[in-house]
Every structure is written in C-alpha cells, then in structure tokens.
C-alpha cells in the first residue's frame, strides 16, 4: 500500500488546476483600442470580431481568475461588444445572487433596462457585488491600481471593464455605488436620473434613491455605446446639447477643512481644463441640498432595515457581519426622522429645477470624495459601510456622492489625474439637471479631450 504525501498532492493539484499558462496571460492588444476605433475597424472588416473573440477567450480565463469579478458567464458568438451586469440586476437565464453566499434565484425575464439592447452588444456575464449592496468587499482586485480598494457596491462593474472582461457594465447607484468603483478603478461612471420606472428587475435597496449606472473606460467609449443600449423609453425628454455649458464649482467642497489638498489640486486641474474649453466655472452654493447629505445615508439605512424582515424570510442564509452592522444603523433611525427625511426630499426635489434656473448653471462640479481613494482595507466586526452620525469624522465620511442621490439627479465621474505617488486615480463628479445624461456625456468627453486618459499599462496576469 502506498500513501500520498499531503503537501505533494496539493502542490501537484495547484500546479495543474488552472487555465493553460502558456498563452493568454497578456491582455490582447485590441482591448487597448478605443471603442470608437474598434467600431470603425469592425465596420470595415466584420471578420475581426471572430479573431478578437478567440483572443478574448484565452485572456478571460486568466484575467477573471486573477481579478475575480465575474459571477456567471455565457457564450456569445463573436460579439462586437461585451456587456456585464451587476448581480443585483435580473438577467433571464442567469442566476441572481445579490452578493449572497448561499442564495440565488433564476428570473423569468431580464430587467427593464436590458430589454432593447442592440444585437451587437452581447450580455456575456453577471459581475460581482457586495452583499445586498451594503456589505464590505466583493472579493475583486483593482486591475490598474492594485493598492487601491475597488470599493462598492458595483465593484464587479468597474473591475470587469478595467480588466477588459467587459466593454461596458451595468450597475446600480444608490449613494455612489457606481461612481465610487468607477473612480477607484480609473474608469468613467454615469449615474442616471432616478426613475422608478427604469428599475423593474433591479433589487431595491433605497427605492427613492436607487438609479441605474454605467461604467466604461472613457466618456467617449460610453458615448459610442449609449445609442446601442436601447434606453430611449427610459431616458425621457433629454436636455439639449450646447456649444458651451454653464458650469460652477460647488462652493462647499472648497473648504480645506473638509477636502484634502490633493483633491483640491485635482479640482483645480479640472477647473483649468474647463476654462480651456471656454467654460470657465464660477462658484455656487447649494445649502439646502448640502445639509441633506447625512439624511441620504439615514434614509438608505432605514430603508434597508425595513426591508430586512422580508429578506430574512426569503433568503434564509447567514448575512455577513458588515451587512448586519449597516442594518443596525438603520434600526437607529426613528420613524419620525424617516418621515421628516421623506418630506425634506419631496421639498428639495420639487424645487431643484428652479434652483438650476436661478443659479444659471447647467452643471455643478465637485470632487469625487474629500480624500483620495482609500487603500485596500481590512474592516473589522462593528465597522459599517453606512456611517452613523455619532462616528468621528462624520462630515468627511458622508462625502459628496449623496448630493446627486438625494436630489435624484444624474452625475458622471471623470478621472482627472493621478495622486502624487502615482498609485491612485483622482476624479471629479459632474452633476446635471434631470434627464441630462447626454449633456453629461458631452461635457465629460470634452473634458477628457483636454485632460487625456490616465496612463495605464497593458495588463498581464
């Protein structure tokens, strides 16, 4: 009788369990092309799609093993573009797991936002999310900025695009859940106007702030694909494009006691670029909306806590401690405060168009966050993704993302430069009126034409 050596056996298994290591470990060159250039090449020579699909097949198994952002995949025959969908959005034929370890359902139909996709866009994957949108960590790695936490909750949406596994990804944005991962990965992230009718088939977290969001490498990439997404029934009457937009920097974010020197310097670079475009920004205050940032977090927390009774009955699985910590914050929001926040939101949203008219601006610009993106972190039991008013540093923790969320407005995040050490992307947010998605794409494209795309390396795993 022979006896296997435990260490030798596991070593042998690990050496042979992955994809063929002899090829496919370097990102294909075609994935470095802009989508506009790829579109031109495919129009001239459609056979390229099959060649590129073969290269993608070799790359994807290595890339996803390393970056760990895809939760389900399905085959597509030589697609022109690949779409990933956050695992809180239903896709017929693929399981929806909601970031939970031991739950899934198989939807009969796809979410409303996916109804009218152009056939050149293939929905090829579901992508990772944090548990129920409110926990720490989706298990993904940041492709171009490996020391930076990719953030959440639409983590896989940003990581899959940054890794070249998707050309575009659909996520959801409640309080920054698309904008944060996009900015942390050096991508562009668009939060759309909040509309209940656009959210059929999307897991609800905070229904009055939930919104669809899209991630691409650049504003121009998103501009190429936006007409192919079939969103016309959801977009509404869009604000008209202009030769010059009226732009203002948010005065509150200029406070050096709140916003770090690095982010203020980045904002200065964005300001100069806008001036070069003939749209020199002024400054504007939004005191009523600014005062609601904490309310946005409290509303989200309370909504999650109220829904948790239904979750517990349906999911029947153990929740991560950080999910429970976030729910605990919601439990502490009183019924009277909850009603007060709803009334405050109604009042603010009812007057937001008049505010833009009176301020004579089309866009308000401010940093993505008070500080640079945070490094990979190791949260401990008791920590929560939802800040509590009693926490130290609360004004910084509630950040700037709730401004678009509480008002229901669209916003786009655009990377402007790298941090001084070159390890982190620094980004602005541009917030527009309701139904200004096309305007936001337009100004973001122009801004990136001046600032340029962030330098990135060709990925190898």
Stretches found by the model and what they are:
Residues 3-167, 171-174:
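Gly/Ser-rich catalytic/binding loops embedded in alpha/beta enzyme cores
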Residues 3-15, 40, 163, 168, ...:
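Structural helix-boundary/capping segments
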Residues 10-32, 80-98, 299-350, 413-424:
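Short helix-loop capping/hinge segments that flank enzyme active sites or metal/cofactor-binding pockets
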Residues 38-45, 102-105, 210-217, 329-333:
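Short, well-ordered beta-strand elements within core beta-sheets of diverse protein domains
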Residues 39-44, 309-406, 460:
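Serine-dependent amide/ester hydrolase catalytic core
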Residues 83, 89-92, 103, 227-298, ...:
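Gly/Ser-rich, acidic/histidine-flanked active-site/gating loops
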Residues 88, 128, 252-253, 286, ...:
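Short, well-ordered beta-to-alpha junction loops that form the rim of enzyme active sites
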Residues 138-146, 293-308:
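Charged, often glycine-rich, active-site loop that binds/positions anionic groups
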